[in-house]
């Protein structure tokens, strides 16, 4: 009943006396106050609803990730009873192990022996086991690669004049970074990942693959100098030949499933084990005798089993590496922690996205908020143990998913074997590699073979990179182009402008990592994401849908979309 009708009713039930007038006045005042309170409550409720729509509940992203993934935890292990798991373990083990050792050598040389093989092996093993068993998305391979090695030795070069403990400083960098990881995860800031498109991912993928090729070349240049410091042309030339021949044969057999030779099963088998067989064969080749006896191939560096590498910068009898540093240095570590968080925010999440591309036809839910929080905890553990902090790997993460794909005879993807066993077991294998017998075996692998593996991984990654594919399309004979390609619908002008943006972004990333300013290259990654927002004003909508699309299907990023998490509640019993 409205206030006006109530007032009329009261006035009719009273005489013209003063008492009736006073009663009427009091009633009207009470109704006015009630109306005012009701309107105030309504305004507050509306404001609460508006706030709730704008800002999701703290931690709701992590809750939704866990809510989606926990029902699949049992099947993540049961589904591992599939043949695709075996070649995936072998391939992922070598793809993760050998490049990590090469980057360990970089850090060993440029941090005065602070980080070595054992630190990198322990970091990769911990990451594989933790994310294999506890991770939300076990397809994403986590370990040590180029960006974090660049970060670690750049920090060392910057703080060396401060005369402070490197491991104490890295401990506080990891502590600050862990705090920022958890803050970003619990405030649902990982939702910003929904705006990451293929443009920055392709740039970063191109950058990583070129860095792998660069690393292979750097390894070969070191083969021309003997341990005594003298030049050794025959050793260097022999190493170059082994690396290039291994690359040629490795790529030939890696791509064997595209050839018409033999049956589909045989082609798949050869392609599956090409990486492992290449490493084993060409490592054995250097022992074939003859003129090879006159060549001294440099081998991979190894150290004492399960002991820290450095005999100067940290105690040898424990993996607890923390050393006290002045309070001012604790706060000097703060901006470095921010840079590390930015690097991992982009590097890890993009690795996870690329491991869940729409063409892989995944069926199980993703996990971004929870995994980023878990990454913060592994970063903390790394600081305590004095090992490089691990994060998502490119190209290892998407390569891992590709090894699990089930294809038909025409190489079309049918499904993917989504499980936890491969990530977990390759982590255990890397941990086992820290034992003395396996370290000795590892020490028999020539550095030339490692260089060849870098070339294989880098070139194989370039062949599937969209930027390279568009360059090839642009310079192809118009009469030989695939008329069914979506790029046929893009004008040459738009193609050139878009490629200019892509190559500029790549050049910026690659250039800054080769300077003292390498610590700031995560900002270049962030800038490439921001640049993509301007494309809507530069390219026609239909062409932009072809040039810059979403990395993963909407099902994969559903917990990153604000419209899906704004009104979500903890322990909500109602399912959509």
UniProtKB/Swiss-Prot annotation:
Q: Where is this region: Disordered?
A: 19-48
Recorded GO MF terms: borate efflux transmembrane transporter activity; solute:inorganic anion antiporter activity
Q: Cytoplasmic side: which ranges? A: 1-84, 135-140, 187-192, 257-274, 351-373, 460-495, 540-576
Any idea where this protein resides?
Cell membrane; Vacuole membrane
What GO terms fall under cellular component here?
Answer: cell periphery; fungal-type vacuole; membrane; plasma membrane; vacuolar membrane
> Which InterPro entries does this UniProt record tie to the protein?
HCO3_transpt-like_TM_dom, HCO3_transpt_euk
Topological region Extracellular: 106-116, 161-165, 214-235, 296-329, 395-438, 517-518
Gene Ontology terms: biological process = borate transport; monoatomic anion transport; monoatomic ion homeostasis; protein targeting to vacuole; transmembrane transport
Q: Topology with regard to the membrane?
A: Multi-pass membrane protein
The portions of this protein that span the membrane are 85-105, 117-134, 141-160, 166-186, 193-213, 236-256, 275-295, 330-350, 374-394, 439-459, 496-516, 519-539
Keywords, alphabetical:
Anion exchange, Cell membrane, Ion transport, Membrane, Transmembrane, Transmembrane helix, Transport, Vacuole
Q: Which Pfam families match?
A: HCO3_cotransp (PF00955)
Q: What is its main location?
A: membrane
Q: Where is the composition biased (Basic and acidic residues)?
A: 26-48
Q: Which family does it belong to?
A: Belongs to the anion exchanger (TC 2.A.31) family.
Other facts noted in the record for this chain: Present with 195 molecules/cell in log phase SD medium.
Give the protein's function: Functions in boric acid/borate export across the plasma membrane, and thereby protects yeast cells from boron toxicity. Involved in the trafficking of proteins to the vacuole.
What is the protein's given name?
Answer: Boron transporter 1
Give me the gene this protein comes from. Answer: BOR1
């Amino acid at each position: 009943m409205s206030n006006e009708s109530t007032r009329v009713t009261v006035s009719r039930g009273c005489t013209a006396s003063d008492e009736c007038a006073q009663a009427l006045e009091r009633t009207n005042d009470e109704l006015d106050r009630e109306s005012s309170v009701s309107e105030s409550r309504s305004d507050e409720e509306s404001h609460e609803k508006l706030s709730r729509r704008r800002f999701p509940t703290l931690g709701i992203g992590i809750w939704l990730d866990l809510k989606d993934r926990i029902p699949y935890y049992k099947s993540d292990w049961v589904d591992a009873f599939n043949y695709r798991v075996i070649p995936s373990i072998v391939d992922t083990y070598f793809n993760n192990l050998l490049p990590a050792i090469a980057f360990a050598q970089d850090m060993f040389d440029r941090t005065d022996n602070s980080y070595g093989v054992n630190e990198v092996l322990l970091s990769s093993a911990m990451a594989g086991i933790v994310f294999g068993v506890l991770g939300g998305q076990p397809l994403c391979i986590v370990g040590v690669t180029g960006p974090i090695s660049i970060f670690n030795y750049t920090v060392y070069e910057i703080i060396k004049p401060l005369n402070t403990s490197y491991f104490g400083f890295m401990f506080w960098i990891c502590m600050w970074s862990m705090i920022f990881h958890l803050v970003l995860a619990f405030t649902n800031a990982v939702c910003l990942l929904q705006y990451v498109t293929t443009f920055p991912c392709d740039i970063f993928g191109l950058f990583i693959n070129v860095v792998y090729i660069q690393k292979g070349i750097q390894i070969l240049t070191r083969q021309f100098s003997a341990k005594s410091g003298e030049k050794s042309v025959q050793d260097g030339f022999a190493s170059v030949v082994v690396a290039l021949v291994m690359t040629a044969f490795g790529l030939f057999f890696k791509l064997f499933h595209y050839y018409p030779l033999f049956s589909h099963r045989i082609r798949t088998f050869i392609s599956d084990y090409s990486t492992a067989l290449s490493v084993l064969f060409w490592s054995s080749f250097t022992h074939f005798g003859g003129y090879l006896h006159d060549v001294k191939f440099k081998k991979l560096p190894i150290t004492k089993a399960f002991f820290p590498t450095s005999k100067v910068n940290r105690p040898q009898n424990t993996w607890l590496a923390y050393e006290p540093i002045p309070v001012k240095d604790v706060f000097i570590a703060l901006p470095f922690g921010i840079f590390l968080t930015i690097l991992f925010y982009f590097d890890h999440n993009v690795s996870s996205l690329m491991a869940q591309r729409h063409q892989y036809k995944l069926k199980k839910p993703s996990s971004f908020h929870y995994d980023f929080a878990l990454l913060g905890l592994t970063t903390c553990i790394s600081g305590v143990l004095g090992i490089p902090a691990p994060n998502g790997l490119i190209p290892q993460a998407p390569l891992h998913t590709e090894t699990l794909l089930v294809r038909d005879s025409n190489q079309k993807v049918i499904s993917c074997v989504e499980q936890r066993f491969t990530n977990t077991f390759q982590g255990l294998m890397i941990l086992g590699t820290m034992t003395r017998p396996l370290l000795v075996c590892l020490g028999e692998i020539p550095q030339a073979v490692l260089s060849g593996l870098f070339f294989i991984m880098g070139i194989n990654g370039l062949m599937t990179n969209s930027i390279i594919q568009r360059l090839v399309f642009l310079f192809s004979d118009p009469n030989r182009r695939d008329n069914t390609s979506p790029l046929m619908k893009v004008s040459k002008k738009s193609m050139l402008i878009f490629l200019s943006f892509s190559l500029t972004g790549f050049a910026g990333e690659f250039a800054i990592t080769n300077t003292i300013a390498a610590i700031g290259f995560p900002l270049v990654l962030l800038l490439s994401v921001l640049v993509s927002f301007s494309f809507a004003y530069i390219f026609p909508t239909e062409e932009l849908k072809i040039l810059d699309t979403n990395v993963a299907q909407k099902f994969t990023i559903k917990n990153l979309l604000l419209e899906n998490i704004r009104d979500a509640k903890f322990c909500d019993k109602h399912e959509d």
